Amino acid sequence: MMEGFPSHLAERTRHRNSVAAPHGSGPVVVWLKSSFRLHENPAIDLGRHIAAEHSLPLLIYHGIDERYPHASLRHHTMLLDAAVDMDEGCRKAGLRYVLHVARDGHRPSVMKAFSQSASCIITDLFPLPPWTNWVDSIAASSTCPVFDVDCHCVIPMPLFGKSVDRPYKFRDATKKMRKKRLQATWPTIDARPEPYTGPLPFEPVNVNEDIKNLSKRFELLSKCSIDPSVLPEI
């Protein structure tokens, strides 16, 4: 399946399980954990490519969990600020973006459900626990292909790997690769897949009503199991 990916996306992508082709007619789900931007986002671009190539609907899923290290009111607030930008950007681009915030009364296993209903899952590569463990678990149980994509590094992690053990060795070994990529314009993906409009395994947060409104935002945050003593910066 990866042989059909655009080269600038293929070099950033890892196939995380043995499922070789999209499964069923469910959505292509782009699961965002750290790369909360629409512009030059390889995970979203790959999702658009796969969805269009296979005539499948596309869904951009942003889940904010309480279980990451040092989860706090400050960090959650920054994540919700990013959600506002993502919601507006995806709407303008004709993409379906949905936000889930884990909190009292709202803690379903969203990705576990998507692992059985999605046609394909793409996520941004974030090689630290607990996120690596979550991706491993979803990839192992999923009925569809699961890919993770490096959305952060100039030299893609899947391309170079771990063959050096010192920063200066890495700089020397990748000098030409880095120069080539820094000078290049990020290719545009013109694919326009249909947005997914079907049922979801959770109730999405209404970003416009419940996140942009700061009173409602902090009411929602009060239901999250996070450290409330680390306050947002003003």
Describe the residue ranges of each PLM region.
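Structural beta-sheet core signal
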Residues: V30, I60-H62, D148
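Short helix/loop capping segments that flank catalytic or ligand/cofactor-binding pockets
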Residues: H39-N41, M157, R178-K179
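N-terminal Rossmann-like or analogous alpha/beta NTP/dinucleotide-binding catalytic cores
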Residues: L38, L46-L59, E66-I122, F126-N133
